Swiss-Prot record:
This is Protein transport Sec1b. Keywords: Protein transport, Transport. Belongs to the STXBP/unc-18/SEC1 family. The keyword Thylakoid does not apply.
Length: 662
């Protein structure tokens, strides 16, 4: 019985992106059978737990799993029929419950399977190893045991989550003994470490440090969240250096650990890119979108679920584009398609693109069966763009978006918000709450006491809404003197780290082709500074500080001058149209074409939830810096989810540094 890891390093040879490596490890390292020179495929059963099912489904298609010899996929907690003539692969978390269930499967008078190959998603404790070794009946039927060290869900070609959906509540809510928060951080750290293990990366671990850590300062648990998480990740990596074969012994990349307090505005502001607006304005479940399609029998429209992911080339091309740009490109695709296909011209007749309905597009499918897949995809995105643009008009989001961005960049203030709330009656209640929370985060002193209460009354906020606004202070690094206030109630105050009213400054050298595209998340600035070695050490300490030559010598791509460019970068240039009206140089095509990058990877992890805008800038900076920037988080947040979570937070008591054990 051996616990080992194999797998090619992420450096050397053909470049493979984060998601490709994840997929190949699951398919080739775990599922692919050893045929021993025989071409005959031996079918096996695959048994997983609820979490590893998510891991597998996020990276691999069912058809890919079947091609590797898996005939049946089962869940370990459910009752299963015996398959005594078949071998089984277990991909499970190393928990006592899972190990007990696995041993039960393989023992007794009638074991469920002929032989078991067990792959654990993360390191196994010594006690569980001993539990397995003690069961001699099960040991006879075990063909192999291995730690895969792959316990994360790939959400994007450059994004992953650790599946800690409640991390924001667990880390920022009041919990006097902090046991729940510590347990959450330990799980998150272990899963971050498995990402690095999968890619064979050993990082410089940098984190957002707590402010003013000295004996005279009172601090809160939440200020130490990145510090504690960094320490826990470091401990996991130290173990991997000793136990994983070919794991790097010197630093190969950079990891920046942050929490949600780094940017309170990003989860609230209306983002105007296609991806962000889909997750904000449409009723999506993760990447799943449900829409109605015309019935083939002529009856009522049928509901259809589709995934907006990297298998959809149109989605990959448009996701980071401004909604106006995305709409223009869809118009161009349709125009080009119709101009190249006579049958489509007949069906299109004299109708303008904007007048085409889903039914019209369905008629095209019947007229052009050879293009059915392309038309289905195109009609889907035409419908989505139309729905988004209609919602923008109905809810007055353009005016709201302009005010939000003016607030963020210091071009508007409290009086402008009061005027807007007094005169605008079509924006939704949720949008009003988001606007008020942005004001509270940017202009704390103008939101104290009576002024803040009047603004919330003007917006007609409910009691739960007021709680969400008040709880914004929990996401900021609150600094207080040792002497506590003797007042019974607290005023609504927020920590202020800025002397200017603007929460953002316009980025030098970047022009905005599209309106409402000024906003950018703080992560963009941090990653650029990190790549140049300009992050201030006192604010972002490093567990293993690099030598001065690291940034000047080894990362030449990031040191190259970057020319200013607009939102419509060459990535989205309109060229090389194929005969069917699609762009042949799509992002997906380039991503999978095996191109090489010279720069070392940058990992950014935001505990407490990440946003679509933060994922967008990771796509952008990967091209700009010539380094793969990978965003990780405990979960991805859409605005509505963030509002719900903020209503569930409570103010916590302050603690002394003496109470913190790292």
């Amino acid at each position: 019985m051996s616990f080992s890891d194999s797998g090619s390093s992420s450096y050397g040879g053909e470049y493979k992106n984060f998601r490709q490596i994840t997929r190949e490890r699951l398919l080739c390292e775990m599922l692919r059978p050893e045929r021993n020179g025989s071409s005959k495929l031996t079918w096996k059963v695959l048994v997983m737990d609820k979490f590893t099912v998510k891991i597998m489904s996020s990276a691999c298609k069912m058809s890919e799993i079947t091609q590797e010899g898996i005939s049946l996929v089962e869940v370990i907690t459910k009752h299963r029929q015996p398959m005594t003539a078949m071998e089984v692969i277990y991909f499970i978390q190393p928990t006592e419950e899972n190990v007990t269930a696995f041993l039960s499967d393989m023992t007794g008078k009638s074991p469920l399977y002929k032989k078991a190959f067990v792959f654990f998603s993360s390191p196994v404790s010594r006690s569980l190893v001993n539990l397995i070794k003690k069961d001699m009946r099960a040991m006879k039927r075990i063909g192999g045991l291995k730690e895969m060290n792959l316990e994360y869900i790939s959400m994007d070609i450059q994004g992953f989550v650790t599946n800690n959906e409640n991390a924001l509540e667990e880390l920022f809510c009041d919990d006097e003994n902090h046991q729940r928060a510590d347990a959450c951080l330990n799980v998150v750290a272990k899963r971050i470490a498995t990402v690095l293990a999968s890619l064979k990366e050993y990082p410089f671990v940098r984190y957002r440090g707590a402010k003013a850590l000295d004996a005279t300062t009172m601090t809160t648990y939440r200020e130490l969240i990145p510090t504690k998480l960094a320490a826990s990740v470091w401990n996991c990596l130290a173990r991997y250096k000793q136990t994983i074969e070919d794991f790097p012994q010197t630093e190969t990349c950079e990891l920046l650990i942050l929490d949600r307090s780094i940017d309170q505005i990003a989860p609230l502001i209306h983002e105007w890119t296609y991806d962000a607006m889909c997750h904000d304005l449409l009723n999506m479940e993760g990447n799943k979108y449900t829409h109605e399609v015309p019935s083939k029998t002529g009856d009522k429209p049928e509901k259809k679920e589709v995934l907006l992911d990297e298998e959809d080339s149109i989605w990959v091309e448009l996701r980071d584009a401004h909604i106006a740009d995305a709409s223009e490109r869809l118009h161009e695709k349709m125009t080009n398609f119709v101009s190249k296909n006579k049958a489509a011209q007949l069906k299109h007749s004299s109708k303008d693109f904007g007048d085409l309905s889903s039914k019209d597009l369905q008629k095209m499918v019947h007229a052009l069966p050879q293009y059915s897949e392309q038309i289905d995809k195109l009609s889907l995105h035409v419908e989505i763009a139309r729905t988004i643009n209609r919602t923008i008009m109905e809810q007055g989001l353009r005016d709201l978006g302009q005010l939000e961005q003016d607030l963020v960049f210091g071009d508007a203030g409290r009086k402008d918000v009061i005027k807007f709330l007094s005169t605008n009656h079509i924006i939704s209640h949720e949008s009003k709450l988001r606007l008020i929370m942005i004001v509270a985060a940017i202009y704390p002193k103008k939101f104290e006491g009576e002024k803040g209460r009047k603004m919330m009354e003007l917006a007609k906020l409910s009691g739960d809404d007021v709680v969400a606004v008040n709880n914004m202070r929990l996401l900021g690094p609150v600094h207080t003197e040792c002497k506590k206030s003797t007042t019974g109630s607290f005023p609504l105050k927020f920590d202020v780290l800025k002397t200017k009213r603007a929460a953002r400054r316009d980025r030098v050298g970047e022009t905005q082709t599209w309106q409402l595209s000024r906003f950018y998340p703080i992560v963009e600035e941090l990653v650029e500074k990190l790549s140049k070695g300009h992050l201030p050490k006192q604010d972002y300490p490093c567990m293993n500080e690099p030598k001065p030559t690291f940034y000047s010598g080894s990362l030449s791509p990031s040191a190259s001058p970057v020319l200013p460019h607009s939102r419509r970068t060459p990535t989205w240039a309109r060229r090389h149209l194929s005969d069917d009206g699609y762009f042949s140089d799509s992002v997906l095509g380039r991503a999978s074409s095996g191109f090489k990058r010279k720069g070392q990877r940058i990992f950014v992890f935001i505990v407490g939830g990440a946003t679509r805008s933060e994922l967008r800038v990771c796509h952008k900076l990967t091209e700009k810096l010539d380094r793969e920037v990978i965003l990780g988080s405990s979960s991805f947040l859409d605005p509505l989810t963030f509002l719900t979570k903020m209503k569930q937070l409570n103010e916590e008591e302050e603690i002394s540094l003496d109470d913190i054990v790292i």
